[in-house]
Amino acid sequence: KYIEPEPFLPSYPACIPHLYNMEVQIYRGYWMVTWFVREFANQEAKEAAIQSMAVEEVLNERLMEIPPGSQGLVLQPYWGPGLSRPEAKGAIVGFSDYHTRIHIYRAIIEGIAYGLREGLEGIEKRQHKKVKEIRVSGGGSQSDAICQITADIFGVPVSRVQTYETASLGTAILVFTSAHEFNTFEEAVESMVHISTTFVPNLEAHKQYDYLYNHVYEKMYPRLKSVYKSVRKYNRKYE
C-alpha cells in the first residue's frame, strides 16, 4: 500500500512489484561525525594514527565512557535543512560544567537516533503498525556502540546483516533473480541475506532515553521554531 511518510514526501516504488520504500531523512545525519572529527577530535586522530586505526574506532571506545543520555545533553540534528523543516537549525541544550567533547559526540549519536525515532513513529501512525525490529546498514552500522545506542533509544532489537554495503547486496539480489538463479525475490533474500549481529535494548537505558525523548527532544523544535526562523533570516546575508 502506498503511504507517504510525511506530507509531500513520496514513497518510492520498490524493485519488487506493488511494494514501496518509505524514507525519513536526517539530512547530513552521520556527516556530523565527520564534522566532529574535523573540529574537535584532533587528540583522537593522533591516537588513531599511532595505533593504525580509524579515528571513528577510537571515538567509539570513548563513546562508552559517557552514560546513556549524555548526562542531560540533548542535541537536535539539524546541521543542514530538511524537506519538512527547512528553517530548522542544529541545537544542543543542557550544558553543564561537567560536560566534555565526548559528551557532545555521544549527544550527536543520540540526537540522530532521536530524529530517526521521531520519523519512524510518524510512519507507524500512518500505516497503523508497530515496528518490532530494526535492520541497519551503512557506515554507522559498523559500530557496535552506535547500534546498541540505537536499540536502546528505539526500544526494539537492532540487527545488521553480513555487510554494511546493503545497496550493493540489493543490486546483487536483483541481478541473480533476473538471471533466474532464484525463482523469487523472497528466495534470493533467504539465500543471500544473513543476520550477523542483533543488539537487544537495555531496558534501564531505554527508560532514560524515553524520558529525554518525550520531555526534552520532542519539545525542542516547537519551542525553537520561531528562533530558527530568526536565525535563518539573519543568515541570508551570508548565503
Question: Which residues are covered by each model-predicted region?
Answer:
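Glycine/Thr-rich phosphate-binding loops that ligate phosphate moieties of nucleotide
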Residues: 1-239
